[in-house]
């Protein structure tokens, strides 16, 4: 059976921590920021841990991470 390939799009967007959690950046900070409050922009600049069902799907795309 051939080796599984890493999904390059998923690899660029998420990181798997040493404990196995999947971490990604929050969305909605690229453009149209003039109408968002400073608090909202600051909060969207942080990373967050994905929910368990999403994390399991991402781990299938990143078999060697």
Swiss-Prot record:
Example GO BP: translation
Q: What molecular function does GO assign, one term?
A: structural constituent of ribosome
Q: Which GO terms describe its cellular component?
A: cytosolic large ribosomal subunit
Q: Which Gene3D superfamilies match?
A: 4.10.410.60
Q: Keywords of this protein's UniProt record, alphabetized?
A: Ribonucleoprotein, Ribosomal protein
Q: Which InterPro entries match?
A: Ribosomal_bL35, Ribosomal_bL35-like, Ribosomal_bL35_CS, Ribosomal_bL35_sf
Family (UniProt)? Belongs to the bacterial ribosomal protein bL35 family.
UniProt cross-references to HAMAP family, sorted A to Z: Ribosomal_bL35
Q: How does it assemble?
A: Part of the 50S ribosomal subunit.
What protein am I looking at?
Large ribosomal subunit protein bL35
* Organism for this UniProt entry: Thermus thermophilus (strain ATCC 27634 / DSM 579 / HB8)
